[in-house]
């Protein structure tokens, strides 16, 4: 049942999504939750969303899809606005926060068990790759040659910088979560002192990134990331058409996973022939070409140039659900008319 809630615990374990802005983002959440319910029908799902999106949920009769509705103020209706303040939304004892452009691929029970070892964590890599906060093209070579990343770490007193991937965040410690968020805000204010490129410079992006600032905050507080790349037990993997086999409804998903992090980082390049060339070149070195076919818990459509299959899937799911609701209403109307005539 859909209902607004106040700041109190709503259960032991639960999922939290966020939705604001264009109605298509609500469609994405609906599609993601549909895939989650293939594997987990018990844990509650809360949606933090604006009033406009609440009205759309009620208009289309999707109340039963969410267990709880959380009012999202406009000041938090952005990537940075929400993820630098998500300590305000710990509505369960143990919380998994999810991006809307995620498809669930298998039962998450063992993922929950693994995350329980942490008070707070975000999926990521111990060492950030070459593309983290940098140009998503061959232009990243300039940052490498000029040692910009190294200078950023020295300036902020860091000895390492993890790669945070905030498509999946976990928390069961409100105080620690607030500390991370507050420090991330401070890091973002000092962006001019870093080598990071504004996310708005990427084609199709109109919001600033929260990831590098959260990663720097976690490094400063020495909080470990939850290993993003774990082979067969990976919590989430990027959707890369070049490396992913799947059916139209994403009920069958297999990702080609390169065991060497450096080789796997080539997935970020937009041009397939360049990716293929680099992978083949480095595969000459023993071990560099080792790979496996894996099914992650989540398939994340985080790369803008790889989102189209998810857009098509979410459109189809939304249209089918709306059609089902209309059919149900029509059937109820016929039953009521028959009863009155009788």
Predicted regions span which residues?
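N-proximal low-complexity "stem/linker" segments adjacent to membrane-targeting elements
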Residues: 1-30
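Short internal beta-strands
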Residues: 45-51, 122-124
